[in-house]
Curated annotation (Swiss-Prot):
PROSITE patterns assigned: COMPLEX1_30K (PS00542)
EC number of the protein: 7.1.1.-
Stated name of the protein: NAD(P)H-quinone oxidoreductase subunit J, chloroplastic
Gene3D superfamilies cross-referenced by the UniProt entry: NADH:ubiquinone oxidoreductase, 30kDa subunit
Entry's Gene Ontology cellular component terms: chloroplast thylakoid membrane
Gene name as annotated: ndhJ
Location(s) in or outside the cell: Plastid, Chloroplast thylakoid membrane
This protein's record includes keyword Transmembrane helix: no
PANTHER family with a match to the protein in the record: NADH DEHYDROGENASE [UBIQUINONE] IRON-SULFUR PROTEIN 3, MITOCHONDRIAL (PTHR10884:SF14), NADH DEHYDROGENASE UBIQUINONE IRON-SULFUR PROTEIN 3 (PTHR10884)
Amino acid sequence: MQGRLSAWLVKHGLVHRSLGFDYQGIETLQIKPEDWYSIAVISYVYGYNYLRFQCAYDVAPGGLLASVYYLTRIQYGVDQPEEVCIKVFAPRRNPKIPSVFWIWKSADFQERESYDMLGISYENHPRLKRILMPESWIGWPLRKDYIAPNFYEIQDAH
């Protein structure tokens, strides 16, 4: 079964993979990193003008990294929002995904957190730098293959 956005993307020849619906009935799509920016723009034009949240996770040790976007479209009133979940998978060695900051400003801190914790580089993000960890921190703490240091010093903690 296809959702509205998936059917619209198929109708216009845009490559994606439907992952079905979650337990709340939200359509979930998989998009390739190289197709993500154009599909994000199209989604915005189609009416998904609110990025509810963005997060990222490590699929498996040595596996892919995923960036997840929940988009909301309010067409018939705030009590009937239409939502879609889009997952963009990137290779672990050099994870690059186009930033959607220029489409949805709310992606700013969320993409920075995903970069800081998992090392996903969001291309064309205006301020992509660590947001939670010190700039001197080595590694990506939420990766499943991350080895925590035996000792680290917290400086200037008051």
